[in-house]
Amino acid sequence: MEVIGTVFSVLGNEMAVRFGRRRWILLVMCISIVCALGLGFVSGISYWATVTACLVYNAFIYADSASLTAGAVGSAEPERKGATMAMHALLGYSGGFVGPLTLGVMLDLMGGETVFSWGIGFAHVAIIMLVGPTALLILKPRDLEGDRGAR
């Protein structure tokens, strides 16, 4: 999964350069939300459907990673690039820590190992993920110089 993630991270940034960073990140975040909404419920179909859904979800989770990092660095004031990267890393790793915990809490609250529990658990993740596109739509960060799709 990490190899797929790394490849999609790099390819995702190339797409951001070609089509516009904000537009690409918004699209990928929305696809990730849709994937999260369905992922837990797919486990009731078959093992291979679940594996495929997990791989697709993983690819889209990573597809905006490099674009977000490049956007953070490219948008930072020159004298604050280090502090910006520190905050970027802190927020990213905090989400990576808190996300699985909240999913686990939701699983426990919903009764554990049922398809419904997993579906609600991942739906909860999707709801939290709405913060990303909402922030992009409200803050409207500029695309970076060199992004061909920039408006």
Where are these regions (language model features)?
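Intracellular helix-loop hinge segments at the cytoplasmic ends of transmembrane helices
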Residues: 67-75
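A late C-terminal transmembrane helix in Major Facilitator Superfamily
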Residues: 75-111
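Residue-level signature of mid-helix packing/kink "hotspots" within the transmembrane helices
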Residues: 2-10, 96-97
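C-terminal transmembrane helical hairpin of 12-TM major facilitator-type secondary transporters
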Residues: 20-68
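Helix-to-loop junctions at the C-terminal end of transmembrane segments
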Residues: 9-21, 107-108
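A membrane-interface helix-boundary motif in multi-pass transporters
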Residues: 105-128
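Intrinsic disorder in cytosolic terminal tails and internal cytosolic loops
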Residues: 139-151
